[in-house]
Amino acid sequence: MEMMPQYDLSRLPENTALKQQTLPTQQLNLSASVVLSIFFITGGFCLSIGIILLLSAKSTKKIEINYTKTCANCAQLRENSSNFDKACNCSLPFYLPEKMEGDVYMYYKLYGFYQNLYQYILSRSNSQLVGKDIWDTTNCDPFQVSHNDTPIIPCGAIANSIFNDTITLSYNLNSSTQIEVPMLKSGLTWWTDKYVKFRNPRSSNFTSTFAGSSKPLHWAKPIYELDLDDPGNNGFLNEDFIVWMRTAAFPTFKKLYRRLKRVHAFAEGLPAGNYSLSISYNFPVTMFQGEKSIVLSTLTWIGGGGLFLGLTYTVTGALTLLASFAILTIHLMLKRSKLNFL
């Protein structure tokens, strides 16, 4: 007589739909009309958004002044690193054809400067930048210590190569009267950078705190003297320094330098007319065949006048609509051939 196997009933799964894997399911049945509707709606939406973004970007007013060749004498001087402490100034007049209404932003723009190199990005000390351990130079090769073996603060390749041109914008009221355009050096950074990623050490005397350290090789003054007039913009919290430390993804990039202070003759923006840029030329670009320029620009609700986002939406929408018409054509041809067969 054959023995029946014995089962431990306590180990059997509960008799529920979930445990027995008998939950009801629903399979989405996509018909040709549903697929075509999705494609047409998606394509129309992306194309509409793209056109809106492009029109908005086109509405920004912008002027770019390249001063690489205009300041050629200074550029030649800066090719020799031993001349880093020698002053060199140049002036660049230009004409603004249209009034720039509202908030106006000044950027510096670099061509051919690769901030996205892996070794360059890693060459920094986050412990220094948050004020936790200003003597930590572990990851700052090859700019860890100076020639006399004292730690560099701030260390690393990014800090060492900071953009250090000084730019002043002036407005020519007439042939004999020139006034300096008031600019703000605050409100240039991201909130997270200013209040999270960069902090000064807890000290009331930066001179004693940073005693025994060296400034980066090509800096004119140490980190604690970047802005003696504004303690909130000094040290690691200096906004020009913070803006530079946020590395760019592409070799051609622009970074915010100043904001227009809307007072007096500039309360409504920058009036059309003759201007001039006075530049203290310090940042070398000719040695790597680069260029640099100043950009004055207004903003819209989507930001600057970049066309990338608008073009992306427009191209995506156009391709989706083309695919929609192709699918529709194939569907009608197959439907007609099926009717002819019957």
Swiss-Prot record:
Give ranges for the Extracellular compartment: 55-306
Q: How does it sit in the membrane?
A: Multi-pass membrane protein
Q: Does Chloroplast show up as a keyword for this record? A: no
Which keywords accompany this UniProt record?
A: Glycoprotein, Membrane, Transmembrane, Transmembrane helix
Record-annotated disulphide pairs: none
Q: Where are its TM segments located? A: 34-54, 307-327
| Tissue expression per record | Specifically expressed in testis.
Q: Where in the cell is it found?
A: Membrane
Q: Which GO terms describe its cellular component?
A: membrane
- Which InterPro entries does this UniProt record tie to the protein? CDC50/LEM3_fam
Q: What superkingdom does the record give?
A: Eukaryota
**Any single Pfam family the record assigns to this protein:** CDC50
Broad class of the protein's primary localization: membrane
The glycosylation sites annotated in the UniProt record are 66, 80, 89, 205
On the Cytoplasmic side, which residues? 1-33, 328-342
- State the family it belongs to: Belongs to the CDC50/LEM3 family.
Q: What is this protein called?
A: Cell cycle control protein 50C
Q: What organism is the protein native to?
A: Mus musculus (Mouse)
